[in-house]
């Protein structure tokens, strides 16, 4: 959501209620996306796209949603597609925004500088996370902080160090700037709240019980369940949780598919936030006067 959805709203291309079709952006008959498994099994990997057009089964529809389905081809509102983490909806928004616009925003504005300027400028990389090297939890948490008030602050491990007399020994001057308008930040905040509070959200009901304070979040799962993610935000903190192995391993073998998808990272985040925020006074997310709510 830090790229496609956020910029779609920022540019005025989509809004909370925009209806989008829950189906692949490219159909098999469009002959745009190769079916790598079919090509590999049939010795077609070395053919050019032009040569491959002689083989209708060498192509596939794209993208699929988590679990392998291609959507039901119905029109659904944007908020619902984001809450359910539907690739079919996210890719359609990303296609409206443009992969290069998304890359420039996340690489330059949000400083996700582990991305590859040559190989990561595409919808699969920018919307579905299929990057060359990926991003770190620290960088991802820093990026999601823009859904508080639109401001980005460079990550840092300390603010200042004092000596025993109270004098400043070290000071870390972090850089802050406006990455999104407050209006866009607030709409995105409310959209991501649905992930935790809506009955259709991928982490529905798994928000921290912290003195009535609201939260927002986003689940993330690799298609092979070798990387599980959750990024959650409260009025005090943004936290990114990654669950996996140094040597990639299919975690459904030990967790089960549904548990791997929704009950690992988000539950770890929930438990952490409930402890960290236990004694903090109530705080609300800032609203934006420019957003009309009904």
Predicted regions and their residues:
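Primarily short, surface-exposed interaction patches in extracytoplasmic proteins
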Residues: 103, 108-139
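Extended, hydrophobic alpha-helical segments in both membrane/secreted and soluble proteins
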Residues: 1-9, 89-90, 102, 106, ...
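Intrinsically disordered or highly flexible coil/loop and linker segments, enriched in small
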Residues: 87-91, 99-103, 111, 115-116, ...
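A penicillin-recognizing enzyme superfamily signal
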Residues: 2, 14-15, 80-84, 133-294
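Short acidic/histidine-centered micro-motifs embedded in hydrophobic/aromatic stretches
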Residues: 22-23, 105-109, 160-161
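Conserved catalytic neighborhood of penicillin-recognizing serine enzymes
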Residues: 13-102, 123, 166-194
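Soluble periplasmic/extracytoplasmic beta-strand elements of cell-envelope proteins
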Residues: 21, 127, 240-242
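Thr-Gly-centered strand-to-loop micro-motif
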Residues: 92-93, 130, 217-218
């Amino acid at each position: 959501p830090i790229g496609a959805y956020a910029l779609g709203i920022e540019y005025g291309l989509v809004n909370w209620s925009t209806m989008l079709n829950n189906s692949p952006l490219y159909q098999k008959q469009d002959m745009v996306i190769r079916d790598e498994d079919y090509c590999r099994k049939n010795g077609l990997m070395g053919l050019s796209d032009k040569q491959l057009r002689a083989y209708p089964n060498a192509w596939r529809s794209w993208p699929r949603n988590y679990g392998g389905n291609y959507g039901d081809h119905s029109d659904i509102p944007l908020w619902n597609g984001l809450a359910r983490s539907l690739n079919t909806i996210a890719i359609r928004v990303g296609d409206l925004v443009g992969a290069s616009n998304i890359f420039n925003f996340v690489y330059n504005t949000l400083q996700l500088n582990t991305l590859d300027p040559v190989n990561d400028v595409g919808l699969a990389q920018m919307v579905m996370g299929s990057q060359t090297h990926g991003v770190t939890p620290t960088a991802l948490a820093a990026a999601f902080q823009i859904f508080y008030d639109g401001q980005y602050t460079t990550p840092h491990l300390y603010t200042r160090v004092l000596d025993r007399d109270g004098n400043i020994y070290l000071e870390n001057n972090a850089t802050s700037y406006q990455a999104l308008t407050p209006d866009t930040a607030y709409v995105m905040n409310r959209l991501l709240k649905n992930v935790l509070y809506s009955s259709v959200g991928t982490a529905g009901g798994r928000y921290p019980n912290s003195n009535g304070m609201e939260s927002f979040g986003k689940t993330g799962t690799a298609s092979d369940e070798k990387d599980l993610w959750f990024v959650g935000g409260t009025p005090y903190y943004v936290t990114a949780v990654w669950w996996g192995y140094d040597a990639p391993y299919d975690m459904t073998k030990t967790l089960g598919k549904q548990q791997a998808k929704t009950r690992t990272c988000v539950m770890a985040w929930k438990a952490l936030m409930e402890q960290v925020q236990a004694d903090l006074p109530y705080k609300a997310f800032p609203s934006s006067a420019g957003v009309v709510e009904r």
